[in-house]
Amino acid sequence: MSELENILGINFKKGTKILEATNSSKKVKKGSIFFGLPGVKEHGSKYSEDALNMGASLVVHNDSNAHINNDDIFYIKDLEDRIVNFLNALYDIDISNNNFFGFTGTNGKSSAAYLCHQLLIKFGYESLYVGTLGIQFNQNKFNKTFSTKTTPDIFELFDILNNNKFEDAGNICIEISSHALDQKRLSNIGWFNSTSILNITSDHLDYHKDIESYRDAKFEIYKMQSSIKLIDEDSSKYKDDYDFVQNDEYKLTTISNKNNFSDIFFRITEMSPHKSFFYVSVNEPPNVYQSIKKKKYKFSCNLFPEFNIHNLIFSICSIGFDKFEENIINDLSFLNLPKGRCEVIRDIPSNVIIDYAHNPEAIDNFLSSIRDYYKNLVVVFGCGGDRDKSKRTKMLKAAIKSSSKVIFTSDNSRSEDFENIFTDAAHNNNIEDVVKIKDRKEAIIHASKILPNNGCLVILGKGHEETQEEKNKTIFFSDHEVINEIYK
């Protein structure tokens, strides 16, 4: 028997060639092995024969209720326990030799993972970023073709590592969405260097149904074995609800800028859109960093506002303080935020910021954080169609609260009517200073025309995205490109 046969515990037909593995029947190619696994709505075994018809060499599944009479389809009861060893052997990659840094949270996942990625590269390590922005190996260009999901599943992750010729003992900074945690996409990875919950507010209730289910999904990240488990202090109040957190030998490390006695306390001493200074006091570090207990570290960076410093603290704590000096100001001015994350557009005559904020808390936090730096905020944003309707009125309320004028526009209306989306958003809101313009490009142009000299145009919701979904069609659209056209 071959190594692959031994791992699965089955005999392949003579001459069987396996070139790649997938759990998606849509990705099956000639030479694939298809893994039929439990899905959100149905079991993948349902697509076993479809996979063979598309060229799969064979199919394996763990559905005890499926009775399929085909010599190329195998039932393996403990299939999920064998997946990682199989993929290691197939791609000649030992995934356990890589260092994983996982970040989840309602807001900030992309920024924290990307900042961690940049820090590792700066200190001479190879690093791979995986998340909403796509994938980036070291400082190469972003590749957005591997997955449409924020977090890949284990098959997609191996495909990414294989295609990037990623060496063992590398570093992988990965965003982990609540959907991925609920679906246990990465539960097969045996060990994470660090796992972090940046914050928990209400989001994705179209999927999770209620805030308790959403929070349960977020805390699943601590079921992944890791020696550094970080959490913001506001979210840590829920930790007693989870026995697996209480019984873990590696305790949660809390991070706060409000409580001086938090495990990790940070304070911003100076902040502006161009330069910020802060310090970190290590009161009670993670188990593996006891040598830095009671130490204090000073930093400078080009990030703002406060929540981006908060995200950076998680990145620093994830890789460890041994990379930094205790008695100097550690200069982190080389760090940049991802495209479309609190992105100040440079070299144009007006103040323009593009950000990805697309839920009530993110909009409120973002606008309230930057309004001290600009006298008038003109905000362009919309609400997604076919998504949680309950947050629409809250999103508009947050935008109205901190702005002098709001331009409500389209943001992936999908199959819904734009007018209905606006009606939901306007409910119980004073819309005296709200202008409704369906065409997003026209909305941005209008906002630029009414922008006061000392004001700031803030474009929210799409960030780095370059598509717009309307009436089941996806078209190219970029907030950045519109700004370039206006100010070129």
Report the location of each language-model feature.
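Walker A (P-loop) phosphate-binding motif
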Residues: 88-137, 142
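Residue-level signal for inorganic ion chemistry
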Residues: 32, 51, 86, 103, ...
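N-terminal leader/targeting and accessory segments in enzymes
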Residues: 1-89, 223, 267-270, 300, ...
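ATP-dependent carboxylate-amine ligase
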Residues: 1-14, 27-33, 43-46, 56, ...
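Adenine nucleotide phosphate-binding catalytic loops in nucleotide-utilizing enzymes
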Residues: 4-6, 208-215, 219, 233, ...
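Flexible active-site lid/hinge loop adjacent to a nucleotide/diphosphate
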Residues: 141, 146-242, 360-363
